[in-house]
């Protein structure tokens, strides 16, 4: 009887150990499953973190490129502003120079016209400005006690021989040739300047303030 009871107690202990082992194996399997799931989730998280890091790197690269591009645009705009300001200053300086040149040109023209007027009265020579520079047209008046002598001329502006002949003729009549030639030269300069920058007539291409005198015109007396 005692032996039967001892075996029964042993069987219970063995059964309890077996059941405990089964529970431990079940817990171990459950724990292993959880560990596997945790590792799997951890791997997914790591992969997601890597993908995110790659995206962040790409975004940082794009951001850096955009920032460099923006810096270049800012520098370009600043350079344009500086160039624009320099251009404005150059334009103002150019306008001032043009204004000064125009003022000096008007002053010079007024002085020349005054000289022409004075020389015209002194030499008694009157020039047709509309005929210049292609032709030299006018008249020299030699004043006398009883009557005046008129010497008209209408000629091309390149006749050197005609000029020499006229100068000799007027000089023989006591005309101040230095003043007379200065008058013609100034009148020619005014005519040339007034027609610039238009193309000068073909006849005046080689004009050098030289007068052509037509000595075939008769001398008039009044």
From Swiss-Prot:
It is found in: Nucleus; Chromosome, Centromere, Kinetochore. The keyword Transmembrane helix does not apply. Keywords: Cell cycle, Cell division, Centromere, Chromosome, Coiled coil, Kinetochore, Meiosis, Mitosis, Nucleus. Residues 51-86 form a coiled coil. It comes from the Eukaryota. GO terms for cellular component: Ndc80 complex; nucleus. One of its GO terms (biological process) is meiotic spindle organization. Component of the Ndc80 complex, which is composed of Ndc80, Nuf2 and Spc25. Belongs to the SPC25 family. Acts as a component of the essential kinetochore-associated Ndc80 complex, which is required for chromosome segregation and spindle checkpoint activity during meiosis and mitosis. Required for kinetochore integrity and the organization of stable microtubule binding sites in the outer plate of the kinetochore. Participates in SAC signaling that responds specifically to disruptions in spindle microtubule dynamics. The NDC80 complex synergistically enhances the affinity of the SKA1 complex for microtubules and may allow the NDC80 complex to track depolymerizing microtubules. This is Kinetochore protein Spc25.
């Amino acid at each position: 009887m005692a032996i039967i009871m001892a075996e029964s107690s042993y069987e219970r202990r063995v059964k309890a150990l077996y059941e405990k082992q089964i529970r431990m194996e079940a817990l171990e399997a459950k724990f292993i499953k959880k560990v596997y799931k945790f590792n799997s989730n951890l791997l997914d998280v790591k992969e997601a973190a890597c993908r995110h890091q790659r995206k962040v790197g790409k975004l940082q690269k794009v951001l850096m490129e955009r920032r460099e591009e923006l810096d270049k645009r800012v520098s370009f705009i600043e350079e344009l502003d500086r160039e624009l300001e320099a251009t404005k200053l150059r334009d103002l300086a150019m306008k001032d120079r043009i204004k000064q040149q125009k003022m000096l040109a008007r002053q010079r023209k007024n002085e020349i016209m005054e000289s022409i007027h004075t020389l015209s009265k002194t030499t008694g020579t009157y020039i047709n400005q509309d005929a210049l520079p292609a032709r030299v047209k006018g008249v020299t008046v030699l004043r006398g006690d009883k009557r005046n002598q008129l010497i008209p001329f209408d000629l091309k502006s390149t006749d050197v021989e005609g000029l020499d002949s006229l100068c000799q003729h007027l000089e023989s009549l006591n005309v101040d040739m230095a003043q007379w030639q200065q008058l013609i030269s100034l009148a020619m300069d005014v005519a040339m300047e007034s027609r610039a920058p238009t193309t000068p007539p073909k006849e005046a291409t080689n004009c050098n303030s030289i007068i052509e005198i037509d000595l075939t015109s008769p001398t008039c007396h009044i």
